[in-house]
């Protein structure tokens, strides 16, 4: 009887896997990097404030203006990668590839900043830009968490920290975002004399994005199966 139940369960899983559409993890990661880098710059351009994951590099770029936002971004990501290795208490080669992905992400930020001013700035457009950027970032992070490849360190950090601590990803993500915002607020107020880069959109994103990413991820899990050269099985979702 037990063997019969196990066979039925395995058969059901195989049928479910066949019904899922297969997506290459490499393509998912490429899309995630492209739309996340654009989403971060578009959110800042909307005037609603920068996304929480890029708020700390933004603060450094405003205080130390000789270094671009993109450069500060991958420097910050390097710190996150090092922190994860310390928490793991071992060298993790995949984290180095994650840093390379983060470097590309940082360079794309500078590329988008160079042309974003061509977009018209009206109040309706600002609202539209924020909505689009919010959705793009959520989709990008959900894709990153499922691509089966090392991902951008700012996306990797909360996912790995959730795995290390055993806490829920959505809770870790919200806490990470809020801490980033607190650091940004402290730096800009102390060095610039005023709050810079943070707006109502930033606060809204920080407190809701983790939940929205989780919801989008569940939607993907019911329809898509991600495979890559590193992880032939579906990456563990968050």
Named regions from a protein language model:
Residues 1-238:
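Core subunits and conserved enzymes of cellular information-processing
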């Amino acid at each position: 009887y037990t063997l019969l139940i196990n066979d039925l369960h395995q058969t059901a899983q195989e049928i479910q896997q066949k019904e899922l559409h297969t997506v290459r993890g490499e393509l998912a990661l490429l899309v995630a990097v492209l739309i996340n880098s654009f989403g971060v710059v578009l959110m800042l351009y909307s005037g609603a404030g920068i996304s929480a994951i890029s708020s700390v590099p933004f603060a450094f770029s405003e205080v130390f203006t000789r270094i671009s936002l993109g450069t500060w971004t991958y420097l910050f990501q390097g710190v996150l990668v090092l922190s994860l290795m310390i928490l793991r208490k071992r060298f993790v080669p995949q984290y180095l590839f994650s840093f390379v992905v983060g470097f590309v992400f940082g360079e794309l930020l500078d590329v988008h900043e160079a042309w974003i001013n061509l977009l018209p700035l009206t109040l309706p457009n600002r609202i539209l830009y924020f909505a689009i950027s919010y959705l793009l970032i959520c989709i990008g992070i959900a894709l990153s968490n499922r691509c089966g490849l090392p991902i951008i360190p700012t996306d990797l950090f909360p996912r790995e920290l959730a795995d290390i601590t055993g806490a829920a990803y959505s809770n870790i993500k919200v806490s990470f975002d809020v801490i980033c915002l607190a650091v940004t607020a402290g730096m800009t107020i102390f060095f610039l004399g005023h709050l810079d880069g943070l707006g109502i959109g930033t606060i809204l994103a920080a407190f809701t994005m983790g939940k929205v990413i989780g919801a989008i991820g569940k939607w993907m899990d019911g329809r898509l199966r991600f495979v890559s050269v590193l992880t032939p099985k579906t990456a563990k979702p968050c």
